[in-house]
């Protein structure tokens, strides 16, 4: 089916009409509907990757309610559970999940992909952040016009190489060290921090490609929303809640109070907000960590706050 407002991407319906079972869907919706049928009607189960973790009951007869009507549309337009299990495409389809390489041309922290320090830092240190009184390759100088030009050229090339990609990330490296040059500081002082020069830069690049979708990361030094700037409509902000403890769901967890405030602020500045969440307890990676009691409440909260995409990192 065509993707519409009432039947968005990956939506589906299962209806019994007379003696016929009608399965309809948009995007991958038909496939997701087929697995829903296997789960809910046939009683199949898939606990993890691999056929050995899949159960399909054997029966000589199957009963389907004559008035069966199911309609389902995703709560989030992007849904990824970043575990090794995502290498099993059947598992991903069974639960209607995404894999970042199916959607992103460039994902995550991209500053060093756009201008690799190994190539440019020695000859053009001015492309990189002025930090602690000297140029360092920790981040880019986002007020440098040559950095802007290089970035535009980079994405033009990458979009030709990967024309099917939906999202393109423009984001700081996984580190601190944002630029403190006079030009960057002029923006950052007005906007409340390095998120100012980042959003100003991302908006400029996004304006060159109005028919493309970009993402950026609200994380570490850029976690707070800018004081005045709004985010371009073709840019999605991915906000991290890495500082929140995992004992309670994020609606009541005291250490998530900052995240809740940041989310509200970003929602007032950006049309599209995703969340980068974590399914682990950082104090001990190897300890068993049950999440069933908290994750559903957290996801429900994010949905009610208008979050459009979820990346759950294990």
Which residues does each PLM region occupy?
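Aromatic-rich surface patch/π-platform used for binding flat ligands and interfaces
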Residues: 3-4, 302
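Feature activates predominantly on carbohydrate-active enzymes
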Residues: 5-200, 204-211, 215, 236-238, ...
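Low-complexity, flexible helical/coil segments
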Residues: 57-61, 250-254, 307-314
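Active-site-proximal structural scaffolding
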Residues: 74, 144, 198, 202, ...
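Generic recognition of flexible, low-complexity loop/linker segments
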Residues: 157-158, 224-226, 262-264, 297-300
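Substrate-binding cleft/loops of secretory-pathway carbohydrate-active enzymes
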Residues: 215-243, 286-294
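Glycoside hydrolase catalytic-domain groove-lining segments
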Residues: 225-233, 241-281
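Substrate-binding cleft of secreted/luminal carbohydrate-active enzymes
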Residues: 284-314
């Amino acid at each position: 089916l065509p993707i519409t407002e009432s039947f968005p991407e990956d939506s589906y319906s299962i209806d019994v009409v007379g003696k016929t079972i009608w399965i309809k869907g948009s995007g991958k919706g038909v496939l997701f509907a087929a697995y829903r049928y296997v789960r809910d009607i046939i009683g199949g189960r898939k606990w993890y990757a691999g056929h050995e973790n899949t159960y399909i009951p054997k029966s000589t007869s199957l009963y389907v309610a004559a008035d069966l009507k199911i309609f389902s549309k995703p709560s989030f337009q992007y849904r990824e559970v970043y575990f090794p299990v995502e290498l099993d495409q059947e598992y991903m389809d069974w639960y209607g999940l995404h894999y970042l390489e199916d959607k992103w041309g460039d994902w995550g922290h991209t500053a060093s992909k756009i201008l690799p320090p190994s190539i440019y830092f020695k000859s053009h240190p001015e492309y990189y952040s002025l930090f602690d009184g000297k140029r360092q390759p920790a981040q880019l100088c986002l007020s440098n016009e040559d950095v802007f030009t290089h970035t535009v050229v980079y994405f033009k090339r990458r979009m030709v190489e990967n024309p099917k990609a939906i999202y393109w990330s423009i984001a700081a490296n996984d580190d601190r060290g944002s630029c403190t040059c006079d030009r960057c500081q002029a923006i950052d002082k007005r906007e409340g921090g390095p998120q100012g020069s980042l959003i100003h830069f991302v908006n400029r690049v996004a304006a060159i490609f109005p028919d493309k979708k970009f993402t950026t990361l609200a994380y570490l030094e850029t976690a707070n929303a800018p004081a005045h700037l709004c985010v371009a409509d073709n840019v999605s902000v991915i906000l991290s809640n890495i500082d929140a403890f995992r004992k309670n769901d994020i609606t009541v967890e005291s250490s998530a109070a900052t995240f809740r405030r940041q989310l509200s602020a970003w929602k007032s500045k950006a049309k599209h907000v995703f969340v980068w969440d974590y399914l682990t307890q950082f104090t001990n990676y190897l300890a068993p960590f049950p999440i069933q009691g908290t994750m559903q409440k957290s996801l429900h909260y994010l949905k009610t706050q208008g979050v459009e995409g979820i990346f759950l990192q294990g």
